[in-house]
């Protein structure tokens, strides 16, 4: 069963290194390379652990480890290629990217093509933890961290409303640092 699952992961990977939200590929946003819900990160974590010979994968022979490493490396290359550049500067990522052009794309109605705070933060954490320590990956991480520093939101406090949902209220005394879920691709302002 585990080998069937791994074969599924290998088969689902696009030639550019990304993975669709669903496989076999369906039309619409399901075909997009999906960072939303950490989908691609979870796949890359499994491949990384397999390639590194993690105890959970003690059964893996060298050929399977090499196959996992190759898929992992393709995934990292895809992450590098998807990092949105604005005026020649690397920024962060969208929650979903087009499977061929790698451009940011819309998913569900509430998920516009945009720069994404949450998915990008988790992607940077993943790269810092498990990414190869190449000059390119260091540049990717540094660029994203600079973008986060320049786009943090201050003067707000996170609270719960009467229905138990999260609200944000203006509070100049707040020491919380927050980021928006989505930022406009042209203005980099919160949406």
Label for each model-derived stretch:
Residues 1, 36-51, 115-129:
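Well-ordered alpha-helical segments within folded domains of soluble proteins
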Residues 1-3, 51-73, 130-142:
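Structural helix-adjacent loops and short alpha-helical linkers that scaffold large soluble proteins
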Residues 2-19, 69-88, 140-157:
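Long, well-ordered core segments of solenoidal/helical folds
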Residues 11, 15, 49-52, 56:
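Alpha-helix capping at helix-to-loop junctions
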Residues 21-38, 89-114, 160-191:
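Carbohydrate-binding/catalytic loop surfaces
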Residues 31, 35, 39, 64-71, ...:
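Extracytoplasmic/periplasmic, Sec-exported soluble proteins
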Residues 91-152, 159:
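Long, repeat-rich segments with strong aromatic
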